[in-house]
Swiss-Prot record:
Species this chain originates from: Shewanella denitrificans (strain OS217 / ATCC BAA-1090 / DSM 15013)
Gene field: tpiA
Secretion signal span: none
MF terms (GO), sorted A to Z: triose-phosphate isomerase activity
Record protein name field: Triosephosphate isomerase
Active site location: H103 (electrophile), E175 (proton acceptor)
Keyword tags: Cytoplasm, Gluconeogenesis, Glycolysis, Isomerase
């Protein structure tokens, strides 16, 4: 069985500020003392430089811990007349290692199709970033028993355009749309069922990828349900939304992941 390092990625969405970043690092410096889990902070792009500077300033205090920086979005284009967009190279230059791709809010609010998501996945990897690919079903799709069908479609188009081995340098996040920002989380059993399906789906084309890819759960993860979720054999941590804005809660989630 592969030893997959747990990950906790905090997606601030359009929230937070430089003071929140400082508060997080103050707590990290005294509490994160080992590398048994990887922590990723994904602030709004305007605060990437603040987080990068905090990573540099706290390098000694965080010695032994794995704290990285990620972005919430990336353009599928390398450069050009795309007002408001940020390229993969720009994110790489800013110190990012990860970037969230295909979050349900981007798909729903900004019309990001699966084809665009696949292009952004490729753009991220082209510039040395590791994509955190989000997949998940809506409430009606779950009620219609189409969960696996929807997720297979979202995975397959990325595989078709980028190849299975692209997942050797990628993270997958299962985020059921009916649980994102609603306070209603999937049960540990529901999460495990879908994570096992994702792993099996990838294993069918590459046993190595299927065994080694990290799959996070995202959808109203809190300190009260994280231990049971992270204990599932195919759940490798969490993509955290609201709880990532509370330094105490986020630190608790990191600690839980470290002992998972």
């Amino acid at each position: 069985m592969a030893l997959r390092r747990p990950m906790v990625a905090g997606n601030w969405k359009m929230n937070g500020n430089a003071a929140l970043a400082q508060e997080l690092f103050k707590k990290f410096a005294s509490k994160l003392q080992n590398d048994s889990a990887e922590v990723v902070l994904c602030p709004p792009s305007i605060y990437l430089e603040s987080v990068r500077q905090l990573l540099e300033d706290n390098k000694q205090a965080l010695d032994g811990a794995l704290v990285r920086m990620g972005a919430q979005n990336v353009s599928q284009h390398d450069f050009g007349a795309y007002t408001g967009e940020i390229s993969g190279q720009m994110l790489k230059d800013s110190g990012c290692r990860y970037v969230i791709i295909g979050h349900s809010e981007r798909r729903r609010m900004y019309g990001e199709t699966s084809n665009i998501v696949a292009e952004k996945f490729a753009a991220a990897q082209k510039h040395g970033l590791t994509p955190i690919l989000c997949v998940g079903e809506s409430g009606p799709a779950r009620e219609a028993r189409r969960t696996f069908e929807v997720i297979a479609e979202e995975l397959d188009i990325v595989i078709e355009k980028n190849g299975t081995m692209a997942f050797d340098n990628a993270i997958i996040a299962y985020e059921p749309l009916w649980a994102v920002g609603t306070g209603k989380s999937a049960t540990p059993e529901q999460a495990q069922e879908v994570h096992a399906f994702i792993r099996k789906r990838l294993s069918e084309v590459s046993p190595f990828i299927g065994e080694n890819v990290r799959i996070l759960y995202g959808g109203s993860v809190t300190p009260s349900n994280a231990a049971d979720l992270f204990a599932q054999p195919d759940v490798d941590g969490g993509l955290i939304g609201g709880a990532s804005l509370n330094s105490s809660e986020f630190l608790s989630l990191c600690t839980i992941a470290m002992s998972a």
